[in-house]
Amino acid sequence: IGSGTGLLLNELKSHFPNIEFEGLDPNESGFHNYKKISKKIEAENNSFHINNSSVENYKKEKKYDLIFSVNVFEHVKDHPKYIDKTLKLLNNGGTNIIISPNYDFPYEPHFVLPLVINKDITYTIFKFFINRHEAKTKERGLWKDLNLNGKKKIEKILKDQNINYTFDYKIKDRILERIFKDKIFKKRQGFAATLTVIGSYLKIDKLFFNFLKIPFPYMKLIIKNEK
């Protein structure tokens, strides 16, 4: 979900040719001319299909063994509806993996900005930087469309719907490791990555996240369809 141009699907298909892959992306905003590019990739490879639809409007009766999304959940307006719909798209025993920012930690990774009290106040303070970022990346409306629910609110939704779920807390170690190994990823995270490196060298990252239980900025949610 949120397959964009299909580049990741194309890469996965090259490594796992016997597995059937399918993408879902609404292309509603027109960001980066995704729809035109994805159609070109499909035509050249003819090995997977990208459905131009949101999850909420997806009409197929087909079910899947695995649904995954990376940095998509925070763009979904209605989290309970999204969780319910994706659960219904899973085969019995299927898995839905959601990787997204955890806004219980007051940091917004798309704009590399701290969150101050709430979304509106943050925008008032950082309006210039937010508008400049959207103009530079040609993603007008990105800030407005962000859903800043954190892990606590997501967990309440899951419990209210009596859904079988777990959080993979090891993602913290993998992301911290990636900051040290992936220069492009580190650069994209800006000042937050610098603080992470300093914290790691001073050994205070474990104090913050393990002992003091300060929320980690990212979360990996695993939902199982088990009846």
For each of these PLM feature ranges, what is it?
Residues 7, 11-55:
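Class I SAM-dependent methyltransferase SAM/SAH-binding core
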Residues 77-85, 95-222, 226:
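S-adenosyl-L-methionine-dependent methyltransferase catalytic module, highlighting the catalytic core
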Residues 68:
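A conserved beta-strand element that flanks and buttresses the S-adenosyl-L-methionine
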Residues 57-62:
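Short conserved loop adjoining the S-adenosyl-L-methionine
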Residues 71-75:
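A short His-aromatic
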Residues 4:
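Conserved glycine-rich SAM-binding loop
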Residues 1:
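Conserved beta-strand/loop positions that form the S-adenosyl-L-methionine
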